[in-house]
């Protein structure tokens, strides 16, 4: 386990493949000579105005609000069919293997809401996840601060990976999958805590003039939510974020659904968190394990890609709209996620004679 962490956090990311999550910007000034200079130069070829416009275009593309044409939507569904409709096929693929569950939180277990501090999951969903964790090893993998997402879920028997996988902690109690006397804690970006706190404070100050903008400190990353910002103010918001980030060459900007994410440039993401957790559970390099990862965000693509590249398990994208994805299947909304999880529990219980 220690070897796995060392191999993945001691190297800065390659400039051509920082993450499967789209990188909008890497911090630093034009004269910076760090390993990220080439990426920064590429982003600044068109100078400020062009850069901001490209950000805004990417912000729109990452947060679709309406379906594409009927034909394109239909083609997408054929390529990424409903996990509910293909449930028997999924069970067939997992036959004879240990299923391990990985779940995003926002937009997957809870609905997307205007106020991120009120993204509560329903009691019914919590009960479903509780039953799921009795049947399979289960982890919550979120961009949120680990303590925050844990306070939302309120289940001590789960593994939690917060800050896009940069803050991982094993079950406190109640998990039959936790190794005896195992105290699991992985925080590969600890050295970045002071700079993230500093950037968070500056972002709060710089975005105060933009109505609806909300900055969240997620411990090892900072999030700028723009769900409640009028679209004609997005360029102003992007400008303010860039004005802060340009002074921090070891940070990068990625994005999700109506959110900009400021993260350390280290070789760690939700995909690495998935691999770390599988190793912690004793399933590294195993052929008899079947990870299922369910998520709705672009940051989940790192995990989807790991599973696709390894031809191991499968990814399920939660989305009503066609999106480019490495996931194999789709579900439209958290309610469908709950139905899928309930069916998994029922199937497992029937196999165990429960």
Swiss-Prot record:
Gene Ontology biological process terms in this record: trehalose biosynthetic process
SUPFAM superfamilies, A to Z: HAD-like
Any one GO CC term of the record: chloroplast
Induction or repression: Not induced by trehalose.
Gene3D superfamilies assigned to the protein according to its UniProt record, in alphabetical order: HAD superfamily/HAD-like
Reaction(s) this enzyme catalyzes, per UniProt: alpha,alpha-trehalose 6-phosphate + H2O = alpha,alpha-trehalose + phosphate
One MF annotation (Gene Ontology) recorded for this entry: trehalose-phosphatase activity
Lineage: superkingdom: Eukaryota
InterPro entries documented for this protein: HAD-like_sf (IPR036412), HAD-SF_hydro_IIB (IPR006379), HAD_sf (IPR023214), OTSB-like (IPR044651), Trehalose_PPase (IPR003337)
Cofactor requirement: a divalent metal cation
Pathway(s) this gene product operates in, as recorded in its UniProt entry: Glycan biosynthesis; trehalose biosynthesis
This enzyme's EC code(s): 3.1.3.12
UniProt keyword list: Hydrolase, Stress response
Database matches in Pfam families: Trehalose_PPase (PF02358)
NCBIfam families: HAD-SF-IIB, T6PP
Functional summary from the UniProt entry: Removes the phosphate from trehalose 6-phosphate to produce free trehalose. Trehalose accumulation in plant may improve abiotic stress tolerance.
Family classification: Belongs to the trehalose phosphatase family.
Protein known as: Probable trehalose-phosphate phosphatase E
Provenance organism: Arabidopsis thaliana (Mouse-ear cress)
